């Protein structure tokens, strides 16, 4: 059964971009609703040490950083729903966002911050090698491989 809710702005995704959008929107008294998706907190929740984020000179664990970002947005009024997007109807205004729970959220504006995911190679040993030389983020991990021979696929 579908239930409809009115929201001014809906944010799809709860990673760094989604949480930042939620923070700024909530501070502007726009009461955003954040649909977290299938990986609440985004890719950073499966990242160990984050050393390239400003304000944390000694680094911070990915899940801890995302928890802080979420709590900060919630403090100003953002509402997070642990639901996954099923469909979006942009043909009529207000827009309608429907989730896996059957909830339908109507909104005046929609921010899509659904993030990205690493493309897996499909190797048998791939999971074991993560964190031991196998990297999916040149920006994040390039520093660790300076002066070493590498392969880019």
What are these regions (language model features)?
Residues 1-12, 28, 33, 80-148:
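FAD-binding core/adjacent interface of flavoenzyme oxidoreductases
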Residues 2-3, 7-76, 148:
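Beta1-alpha1 glycine-rich phosphate/pyrophosphate-binding loop at the start
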Residues 149-153:
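Short beta-strand and adjoining strand-loop segment in the mid-core
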